[in-house]
Amino acid sequence: MAIDPEVGFTADVIRDPGRFVGRTELIKDCITALNATTGLISVFGKRGVGKSSLLRQLQQMALGEYALVKSAGLTNYIPTRARSYLTVYYTCDALIKDGRDLISRLINDQDPEDGLLRLVPNDGKDIVEFSRSKEVSAGADLKVVSWGAKGVESSKYAKVVPNDVIQTFRNFVSAIVEHQVQRRMHRDGLLIILDEFDVIQDKQGLGSLIKSLSTPQVKFAVCGVGRDLNDLIADHASVERLIEQGVLAIRPMSLAESEGIIYRAAELFKGTVRFAPGTAAAIAALGQGYPYFVQLIGKQCINELNSRGGDTIDDEILQAVVSGLKAGKAFPILETAYQRAIGGSEGRAILLHLLAEQATEASTTDEIGRVVLKNSRTVAEELGVQFVDQVMPRLVEARYGPVLERIDQGVYEFVNPVLRQYIRLRDIG
């Protein structure tokens, strides 16, 4: 019988604390940020480093569920009187134009487990407690079972102000804090989590808005692709005082943590899959600290195991996966991005590989490192790429990715470091 790769590996966001691996220092930072009386929590980093997975763990801790903290051996970091919250979780998208648009989305979000609207008091609404974790002692959140006869109409508890989404939002939040957070659940506050915050088109004024709405009873957490807070919030000066204890910069994992993903997967497979000595380290080395890529490679190893039979992932199976990767057959999403970027041009493919393989120095603000075109130009020309300046533009055009972001004259950065590592491993063409 075929083994389900999803039992041990997943490319999806990790919600279950039992599947979460490593990130000890970040877990400590989450505890500190949640237990600060006021303050904004900011989570940022490159693609593929596990931002959304950490954010879901932050949500669990906010509810009072500290199983992850205890399993990480950090029980002594849990305060005697830990602050607890009800939570709202919203994933932004590129169609959100600005702050007003975002608030409009929030006050109309009907998600039964994560939406703001589910918590607005309403006489006809059937709300029950539920756990986001498998743990028996998990802190409860609230979800809607039935919206009732009134549907999602506002109630006497929270007034909708026509043509004023900001004041309507304030009214909703005030009603939630009074009736659900304090009276019903006896919690300390409401935590509003905004994932993929970076895709909002115009973020000007959002810092000021968040500052005006933040109180000891209302806390915000924003998460997105970025190097620092400035990449997430345009008017970041507005919230600098709020964020002293809430900056969570996510870097690539250590090799030991990446190996931990494989060891945890082996536990989850409960004996149906074994990993030969050295295999976990080899997969971790291929993943280069990006948990998303480690998970993808792990899943593909299980698929290869299923095609051959047996119960052991060894070097032979891993090399078969690597061969498929080199040929562009293993990971269709990454391969599609690669082919879109090179556009059938051998010269562009050569240049892209040279840039991906270019040695870069990590720094405290940019763990990926930047690439310099002139450092690869000579080698590219020696390999037959005659018109470097003609093949380069497609790599920075949005409609083809973009694969690269222009930082300065002749200086670029890979938008997706997982794709960069994929290109390093793939054969040219």
Predicted regions span which residues?
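Short, conserved phosphate/pyrophosphate- and ester-handling motifs at nucleotide-, phospho-/glycolipid
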Residues: 23, 52, 290, 416
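Glycine/serine-rich loop-strand microenvironments at binding/catalytic pocket rims
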Residues: 20-49, 144, 210-211, 216, ...
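P-loop NTPase nucleotide-binding core
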Residues: 39-192, 199-201, 218, 376-378, ...
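Active-site catalytic microenvironments for nucleophilic, acid-base chemistry
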Residues: 57, 61, 65, 109, ...
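An amphipathic alpha-helix signature
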Residues: 99-107, 255-263, 280, 365-373
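The catalytic "switch" region of P-loop NTPases
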Residues: 6-10, 182-191, 197, 201-288, ...
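A short, basic N-terminal segment
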Residues: 1-44, 61-73, 78-80, 429
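C-terminal leucine-rich, beta-strand-based interaction scaffolds used for sensing/assembly
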Residues: 2-7, 319, 323-429
